[in-house]
Amino acid sequence: MPLRIILLGLPGAGKGTQADFIAKHLDIPKISTGDMLRAAVKAKTPLGLEVKKIMESGGLVSDEIMIALVKERVKLPDCHKGYLLDGFPRTLAQADALNAAAIKIDLVIEIDVPEEEIIERMTGRLIHPASGRTYHRRYNPPKVADKDDVTGEPLIQRADDREETVRHRLAVYRKQTSPLSDYYAQWEKSGDPQAPKYFRISGLGSMEEVRERILQVFEAYDPRDSGNLEH
C-alpha cells in the first residue's frame, strides 16, 4: 500500500535529517519544491518554461503552478510506493489547493520542538570559514571556546544563525505554517475518509530517538483508524 507523507516542524526541528531517513526507510522519493522547480526548468516542459520566465524576472511561483508541478511529479513511476513532500504545503491555501487537486496524502507527521530549544540549537552553531568545519556550543564544542580545533583560528556564527534572524524565521513559520497542524488534526477528527492520519511526535533527544518515534508512527499507522500519537 503506498504511503504518501507530509512532514511538518519548525525550522531547526530536524526535518531534513528525518526526511532523508523516511525516504530511505520506505524507499520512496523525497519531493522538494526547489528540486521540482529546477527539474521542470531543465526538462523544458511547458510548465518549466513558465517557471523559468517567472524566476528570471524575480517573481514568485504561484500556488497554482506549484500544485500543477506536484501533480505532474507524483504521477512518475518512482512514486508508486508513495512519496514524501518536503517543504510543501507551507500555507493553508496550499493545503486546500493540494486537497482540491486530489493529490492524496495518507500521513502527516509533525516533529514538535519547543521554540527556545530551536533557538539554542540554531544560535549555538559555529563554523570555521576556511575549512567548513562546524561546531556547536552545546553539542559539539571546540576544545578552546570559539577557536578551531585544528588551526586555532576564530570561529564565526553565520548571519542565518543569529538570534534575531532565527526568531524572525520562527515568527514567519508561526504565522504561515503553524496553522497546518490544526488543519490536519481537525480534518482527521472530522471523520472524512479522505483525511490523512495526523501524528505529532517529540523532536527532543538524539537523532536516533526521534527516528525511533517515527518508526513507532509507521507501526501505529492504520489507514482504517484515526490516530494521534504523542510522546
From Swiss-Prot:
Q: What does the entry's domain section say?
A: Consists of three domains, a large central CORE domain and two small peripheral domains, NMPbind and LID, which undergo movements during catalysis. The LID domain closes over the site of phosphoryl transfer upon ATP binding. Assembling and dissambling the active center during each catalytic cycle provides an effective means to prevent ATP hydrolysis.
Q: What is this protein called?
A: Adenylate kinase
Q: Which residues bind AMP?
A: 33, 38, 59-61, 87-90, 94, 158, 169
Q: What class of enzyme is it?
A: transferase
The GO terms this record gives for MF are: adenylate kinase activity; ATP binding; nucleoside diphosphate kinase activity
Which Pfam family, any one, appears in the UniProt record?
ADK_lid
Cellular location(s): Cytoplasm
Naturally occurring in which organism (per UniProt): Coxiella burnetii (strain RSA 493 / Nine Mile phase I)
What gene name does this entry carry? adk
